[in-house]
């Protein structure tokens, strides 16, 4: 499975959310998106759940959050 990387660290809201949504819209059936953010995006996680995406979250050693997202 190929991964589309969206690194939105260091951006001011709402740009990280907008980049995440753009990445989701471009996500193919057999692709995974790796989203890297400065903080846990709780509103985005609710949208992912509502829209049926599979996602996992992990904190990196540098404090950033990695979210792996794919279509169900």
Positions of PLM-derived features:
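Residues that cap or initiate secondary-structure elements
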Residues: 12, 41, 61-63
């Amino acid at each position: 499975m190929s991964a589309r990387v969206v690194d939105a660290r260091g951006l001011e809201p709402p740009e990280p959310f907008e980049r995440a949504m753009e990445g989701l819209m471009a996500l193919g059936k057999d692709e995974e998106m790796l989203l890297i953010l400065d903080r846990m995006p709780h509103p985005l996680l609710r949208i992912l759940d509502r829209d049926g995406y599979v996602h996992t979250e992990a904190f990196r050693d540098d404090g950033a959050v990695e979210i792996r997202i794919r279509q169900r």
